Amino acid sequence: MRGVADFDGIAAAYRWMEYASVGPMLERVRWWWLDRGELDGARHALVLGDGDGRFTRRLLQKNRQVRVTAIDLSRRMLGLLKRRCRVDKERLRTVQRDVRGEMPERGIDLVVTHFLLDCLADDEVEPLVRRVRASLQPGAVWVVSEFAIPAGTLRHPARLLVRSLYFAFSVLTGLQVSQLPDHTGALRRCGFSAIGKKAFWGGLLVTELWKLEPEAKSPGE
């Protein structure tokens, strides 16, 4: 992310921009673990950068016990999220701040980042993971959904698509990142283990489940 990207200008149109570029695929990716009951046991979720709130609303609807803290830098995106979740507003807390700052909660058992980590520079991911980790219960689960560059014949088309998306967001929001970070290495170094993965579109889109090992330590601890 480097400098602060401004998503306010595209908040109202973001859903339709998403549909125009990749259709409903990102929603399928977001819903994957939730619709299969993998998140039913969560009681306090930290949702970072959910944008207009479609995932947060679905989580609150499907899990009637969970409380959600949603953090986003964009005031307009948070406004859309709150309107979408107004029926369950008693179980929702919203915080407008840069996700690269300190986390405001403790006792989190579920973290969700859908298409957020790819907005960060490679050297920003591990510090974020360390800060989030300090807020988590042992055994907490982290859902990560991202674009990826698959091996094989789709590698070059995938690179072209990802490059074009980064260019579009640099123009529309001022995003300064231009390549996918290594989030898997950062999570492993901070004590998380991969427990599930689903790939879409030949590996161009992936959603993963990571679990914080009970005795894990972050680098430097």
Question: For the regions a protein language model found, what residue spans apply to each?
Answer:
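N-terminal, positively charged/glycine-rich alpha-helical extensions of SAM-dependent methyltransferases
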Residues: 1-13
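A short acidic, Gly/Pro-enriched loop at the edge of an enzyme's catalytic core
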Residues: 103-111
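A short glycine-rich, Lys/Arg-flanked "PGG" loop and its adjoining helix->strand segment in the class I
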Residues: 126-138
